[in-house]
């Protein structure tokens, strides 16, 4: 499979925004010694999000115990203790940034008995203690199928529970070798089962070698497992050691994914565009919660 990384189309070229807020957010994160997935995963939207005073916090990192070949987060299989001050620092950042909606994600921590579920809970508690009106979205790993760990997170009552399906099942062995497609679907199905009031969310990348029909089948699977919100974005290879881009999906095709997701499958929201990432414009969920209250 040949890489297309050197032929990036115009619709994927992002101008670096000039805004004093970007420096403020970056300095605050540095002062509080907090990681963001925006920085660690080289997100193309980092300038826009920082300019808007938002960030997706990456806890328990920065190293990940899995080495998915599409991801730019550093691999680190060493056993590392959790930082007990991290939740408090995260809560302080949310307060100082005045966030109305916060996204908290993590690296995979397969070295921990509960996969880091307890740290997620502590972060939820810290955010609610420092900023009671802030809605909370979690983007969680699969916890290796540890459903007790999953229940621990659900019992903390996040407003949105996100777990990314990432790609089509045919490509799992290549792109997500330590993940299981059916296990991820099972996790998403359990969101509604455990907490009917929590909105469930999942995202996938295109451009890894899937077909459009396979994308639609994933949408069908997500719908069948009670997912409310879906994000679809273009895969961009972080470097030569990562999986190459197989194709650049056009904006028109992304619009077709969105239309299919909303009209055929009836998701509450489908965010689909070349630069969409799982937490891009995540704050719009507050409007969604007003339209579809639970």
Swiss-Prot record:
Pfam families: Radical_SAM
Key words of the record: 4Fe-4S, Cytoplasm, Iron, Iron-sulfur, Metal-binding, S-adenosyl-L-methionine, Transferase
Binding of [4Fe-4S] cluster 2, residues: 64, 68, 71
Pathway noted in the entry: Protein modification; protein lipoylation via endogenous pathway; protein N(6)-(lipoyl)lysine from octanoyl-[acyl-carrier-protein]: step 2/2
GO MF: 4 iron, 4 sulfur cluster binding; lipoate synthase activity; metal ion binding
Catalyzed chemical reaction(s): [[Fe-S] cluster scaffold protein carrying a second [4Fe-4S](2+) cluster] + N(6)-octanoyl-L-lysyl-[protein] + 2 oxidized [2Fe-2S]-[ferredoxin] + 2 S-adenosyl-L-methionine + 4 H(+) = [[Fe-S] cluster scaffold protein] + N(6)-[(R)-dihydrolipoyl]-L-lysyl-[protein] + 4 Fe(3+) + 2 hydrogen sulfide + 2 5'-deoxyadenosine + 2 L-methionine + 2 reduced [2Fe-2S]-[ferredoxin]
InterPro entries named in the record: Aldolase_TIM, Elp3/MiaA/NifB-like_rSAM, Lipoyl_synth, rSAM
Subcellular compartments: Cytoplasm
4Fe-4S in keyword set: yes
Residues annotated for [4Fe-4S] cluster 1 binding in this entry: 38, 43, 49, 279
Keyword Nucleus among record annotations: no
Residues spanning the membrane: none
GO CC annotations on file: cytoplasm
Radical SAM core domain ranges (all copies): 50-268
Protein name: Lipoyl synthase 1
Record organism: Prochlorococcus marinus (strain SARG / CCMP1375 / SS120)
């Amino acid at each position: 499979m040949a890489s297309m990384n050197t032929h990036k189309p115009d619709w994927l070229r992002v101008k670096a925004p000039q805004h004093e807020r970007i420096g403020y957010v970056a300095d605050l994160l540095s002062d509080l010694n907090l990681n963001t997935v925006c920085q660690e995963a080289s997100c193309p939207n980092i300038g826009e999000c920082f300019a808007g005073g938002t960030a997706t916090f990456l806890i328990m990192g920065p190293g990940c115990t899995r080495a998915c070949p599409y991801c730019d987060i550093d691999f680190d299989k060493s056993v590392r203790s959790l930082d007990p001050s991290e939740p408090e620092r995260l809560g302080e950042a949310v307060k100082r940034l005045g966030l109305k909606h916060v996204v908290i994600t993590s690296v995979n921590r397969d070295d921990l008995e509960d996969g880091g579920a307890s740290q997620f809970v502590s972060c939820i508690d810290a955010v609610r203690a420092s900023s009671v009106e802030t809605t909370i979205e979690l983007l969680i790993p699969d916890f290796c199928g540890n459903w007790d760990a999953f229940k621990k997170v659900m019992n903390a009552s996040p407003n949105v529970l996100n777990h990314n399906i990432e790609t089509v099942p045919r490509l799992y062995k290549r792109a997500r070798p330590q993940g299981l497609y059916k296990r991820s679907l099972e996790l998403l199905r359990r969101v509604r089962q455990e907490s009917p009031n929590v909105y469930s969310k999942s995202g996938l990348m295109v451009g890894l070698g899937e077909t459009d029909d396979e994308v639609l089948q994933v949408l069908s699977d997500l719908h069948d497992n009670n997912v409310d919100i879906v994000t679809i974005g273009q895969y961009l290879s972080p470097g030569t050691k990562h999986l190459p881009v197989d194709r650049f999906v056009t904006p028109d095709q992304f619009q077709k994914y969105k239309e299919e997701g909303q009209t055929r499958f009836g998701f509450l929201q489908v965010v689909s565009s070349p630069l969409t990432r799982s937490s891009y414009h995540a704050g719009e969920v507050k409007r969604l919660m007003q339209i579809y209250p639970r």
